[in-house]
Amino acid sequence: MIHKRMNSTELERTSKKIDDYDSSDEEDLRNTIGNIPISWYDDFSHVGYDKDGNQIESAKKNDDMEEFLDRMDDSNYWRRVYDRQSGGFVTLNDEEVKKLNALDASKYPLVGYNPYQPFLDIFSSQTEIHPISNRPDSKRSFIPSLDEKRLVGKMVHAIKMGWVRPSRPKQIEKRVYDLWADNPCSEKTKTELARIRMHFPAPKVPLPGHAESYNPPAEYLCDEEELKKWEETDPEDRRLDFIPKKYDCLRKVPAYDRFYNDRYQRCLDLYLAPRQRKMKLNIDHTELLPELPNLTDMRPFPTTQSFLMLGHSGQVRSLSFEPESTEIFASGGEDGTLRLWSICDGRCLKTTSLDGSITSVAYCPLAKWTLLAVTMESNKMILTNSYCGDRHRITTTTEYLSKLRCESSESDVLKWKYEGKGTLSVDLGYIARQVVWHHKGDYFATFANSKSPKLIYIHQLSKCKSQRPFSRLKGLMTVLSFHPSEPFLFVGTQRYIRIYDLAKCQLKKKIITGSQWMSCMHVDFRGDNVFVGGHDRVFSWIDLQLSSKPWKSVKHHTAAIRGVTQHARCPLIATVSDDSTAIVYYARISSDSLKENEFVPVRRLRTQTAQKNGLSILAAIFHPSQPWLITAHVDGSIALFT
């Protein structure tokens, strides 16, 4: 192959093409002087040389008129920054402007950066007394090591052969006294140590107040009477040692004429005034923590899940135990079925299908009847005989319901109707959220989540009549409950609970719940304490004998609280939440007014139910006599914790 030699003209063209298409890291620079300090050419008329060796003239600066015209014509003039390296202006983008603003405000230049990330405490605050692993020691830990035996043998042989020599004594360096050292090398005497130990720091000079300002407020300035009184008072009895004065600016303030006098008085105070040693308490921080009671003293309380009761195909919204019975409880769900369960073996005893989803179920508190009140989404409420349990009580309930007169007139607010087979129905006209009984068993109330007072009714079973107790309602209705012994009605809105005296038809007390949105309420069996749970995860204990505000508020759940229940005999309270947990508290109400109530969380019970639409556990109830807890779940299951 024959190669032609390129002449000088072709070689020049080729090199020019290569230079034109060659890329470099400095393509954004207008000149090609390289990455060198531009200050090298401050004394020259040029700023460097190009690739051909020609001088690059420095850019001419615009005069004031040209800069003014550029400022008026260019809308991005305020974004332009002069780049001395390239000799031109650079326009900043939005991100660079934000970084500059952040740096100017003493913030991080990275927009959106959060320097305060959540801290995860990986260490436990509880001191354990038992080891994590209690595995017994192996056999080889009691037998001498063979490797150590061989190593010792080699060392003995080396000593015998003279290969190992004893280490030479270290030469003691000459210690020179350091005159300017903070801690001298020589040990201090007892007198010096006592002087250091008994050193009392001097008290600090009090900070100046508003009266010592060069421009004090008008109330600190003295008028003629106060000035005359100050001059007549002895120097020892004066409240201030000086007369406050006002100046227009700081440069007009003269020198302080009492400076040397104040320094002299300070020296006299330090020299003559005795100092007192401040005793420090060396207390372990663990001793400052409150002593928690022993859990064994709080037993019994539910600890484990015994079994699940399955049968409902939707949400289980309400639970209720038969009065003075320890075997049967009722449940109502979204599937429109009313089920009666045996607590002993978890067997479903009876299932009744209704014409709507059930919102609430409540047994009549009278033990002589087996009467159930059920509210449904079909705008109806029924009073039905459970037909489960003691036969004598079932017969008594049927006879009582059949003798009731359900004759309705035009003046009646609601229409009562006897359906036969031990069932009464009331057409409410709205979806009732809950039904609650009075302790005597003749009155019960229903309400809906609304601001209208027309959706709150008190019903009388013996007369088959209903009435509206309120003509006006403040706030959105959320909960309702009767007083256990007095004719009082607890009406709960989002943030407040109002106690009404039904006998006198007047407001008795207004309670602040401490929650932003109350979801459930329980009044204790004496009526002196109210337990409140809210959608904002706050659980409050309100002692009505102490105050109308919460005595104790905790936030142990991570989701909204759906139910609060109290045990009839044991000092136990339980809350259930959408975080699939139920927390059991030991809550002993003190009968002595001088002794404080006891409130300690003892157990967190977890369920394996799946959440649906953010809901998990909807209701809970304690066994009447045993320390057992029953919870109703959104997936249709009912759990028993023992």
From Swiss-Prot:
Keywords: Nucleus, Repeat, Ribosome biogenesis, rRNA processing, WD repeat. Coiled coil: none annotated. PROSITE patterns: WD_REPEATS_2, WD_REPEATS_REGION. One of its GO terms (biological process) is maturation of 5.8S rRNA from tricistronic rRNA transcript (SSU-rRNA, 5.8S rRNA, LSU-rRNA). Residues 1-28 are annotated as: Disordered. Residues 10-20 have a biased composition (Basic and acidic residues). Gene3D superfamilies: YVTN repeat-like/Quinoprotein amine dehydrogenase. The keyword Nucleus applies. Pfam families: BOP1NT, WD40. Required for maturation of ribosomal RNAs and formation of the large ribosomal subunit. InterPro entries: BOP1/Erb1, BOP1_N_dom, WD40/YVTN_repeat-like_dom_sf, WD40_repeat_dom_sf, WD40_rpt. GO terms for molecular function: ribonucleoprotein complex binding. It is found in: Nucleus, Nucleolus; Nucleus, Nucleoplasm. WD repeats lie at residues 311-351, 353-393, 472-510, 513-552, 556-595, 612-642. This is Ribosome biogenesis protein BOP1 homolog. GO terms for cellular component: nucleoplasm; PeBoW complex; preribosome, large subunit precursor. Belongs to the WD repeat BOP1/ERB1 family.
